Every structure is written in structure tokens, then in C-alpha cells.
Regions:
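Conserved acidic catalytic loop of the alpha/beta-hydrolase fold
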Residues: 158-162, 166, 173-183
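N-terminal cap/lid subdomain of alpha/beta-hydrolase-fold enzymes
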Residues: 88-156
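Catalytic-loop region of hydrolases
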Residues: 2-3, 7-100
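Generic structural hydrophobic/aromatic packing signal, biased to beta-strands
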Residues: 67-69, 104, 136-138, 175, ...
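Catalytic micro-motifs at enzyme active sites that drive phosphoryl/nucleotidyl and oxygen chemistry
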Residues: 74-77, 122-126, 181-182
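Short, solvent-exposed coil/turn linker segments
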Residues: 23, 68-69, 110, 129, ...
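Conserved phosphate-coordination/catalytic loops
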Residues: 81, 170-173
């Protein structure tokens, strides 16, 4: 189930390069195509938490993980390298992988679901019941709280300086593809 805080829209399918889908939702179940045994972050993504010295905002979000995507091509055709993707999870993914709930944050939000939807997150009786669901929230492109944004270093290299106003324009499609990349 994919929930957007602005539209509560369901996203049915997306692909890494706009061609083959990496995940789909069918009859309420999340299917990771091609690799049902892989975890949310796979072998090609390095994991690090709170280790972005160039980005002081990344450490403001407790309990998030930052995966590094080696290469990511935007809808515009521009390719970013060593792209950080911050995300947080609550609950446990079931062996059948049929209990995933992906929540997208608002434009100015972060991957910390409990910060902005706290009253809905918890145990039985809550909308986001983490005793039943595996809740994951990925930080959107352009948000400074750990994901690729104007405050991150170009290509992940501090010697290149920060993107600043040169950070490329992104689309909702880019965010969907970016959020599904580690699957």
C-alpha cells in the first residue's frame, strides 16, 4: 500500500529505468519482482546511518538509514552518482512480503513517520498498526534530511562541493523510481 500524505494515492507499478518494474502491488500485496528473497536494501547499496558530515540535517532524524545508490538517472536524463537515500522503517516485513505500507512525506517533511503522523502510528487500533504492517518511509529527492538535495555533495564527494542551486529539478516520477530503487 503506497500512501501519499497529499493525495492518499496508490501507486501500482514503477521501474528502475522506466522500463521493467521492480515492484508492484496487486490485491493489497507488495511484490518485489525478480528477487523475492532480497531485503529492502540490496547488496549494491551501502548502508550508513547519521554519517553525512557534509549534511547537518541528516542527523536530525533518529533511527533512519541512509542507502547509497551508485548511479541514478532522473527523468530529465541527468545522472547523479553516489546518491544518498534516507529511509526509516517500523514493524516487521512478513515472510510473504504482503504487509508493506510505503508512506510518502509532505514536501517539507522527512522520513520520520512518527514525527508527523505519530497519532496514527502504533499498535492495534491505529491506522499504521506496526504489529501488523511493515511501514517504510523514504525521504524524497530534494529534502535535506539525508537524501540527495542541494545540501549534499555532488556525486557524494566533498571535494566537489555541495549541489546548492545547481541541484537538478526532479519530478514525482523521479521520487517514485528513487524510492523503489533499493527493492
Amino acid at each position: 500500500m503506497f500512501i501519499s500524505s497529499s493525495s492518499l494515492a496508490m501507486i501500482v507499478e514503477t521501474g528502475r529505468n522506466g522500463s521493467e518494474p521492480v515492484a508492484r502491488i496487486q490485491y493489497g500485496q507488495l511484490y518485489l519482482i525478480g528477487s523475492p528473497q532480497k531485503d529492502i536494501v540490496t547488496e549494491y547499496a551501502q548502508e550508513r546511518t547519521h554519517q553525512q558530515p557534509e549534511n547537518p540535517f541528516a542527523s536530525l532524524i533518529p533511527d533512519q538509514t541512509i542507502a547509497i545508490i551508485p548511479s541514478f538517472t532522473l527523468e530529465s536524463g541527468e545522472t547523479l552518482h553516489n546518491v544518498p537515500l534516507a529511509y526509516s522503517t517500523r514493524g516487521r516485513l512478513s515472510p510473504n512480503r504482503d504487509n508493506a505500507m510505503v508512506i510518502c512525506h509532505a514536501l517539507t517533511g522527512s522520513a520520520d513517520v512518527s514525527d508527523w503522523w505519530g497519532p496514527l502510528l502504533g499498535g492495534p487500533g491505529r491506522a499504521f498498526d506496526i504489529s501488523r504492517f511493515f511501514v517504510i518511509c523514504m525521504n524524497s529527492l530534494g529534502s535535506p534530511y539525508g537524501s540527495a538535495s542541494p545540501v549534499t555533495c555532488k556525486d557524494g564527494n566533498p571535494e566537489n562541493g555541495r549541489y546548492g542551486p545547481e541541484f537538478p529539478l526532479t519530478t514525482i516520477r523521479d521520487d517514485v523510481k528513487y524510492g523503489m530503487y533499493p527493492c
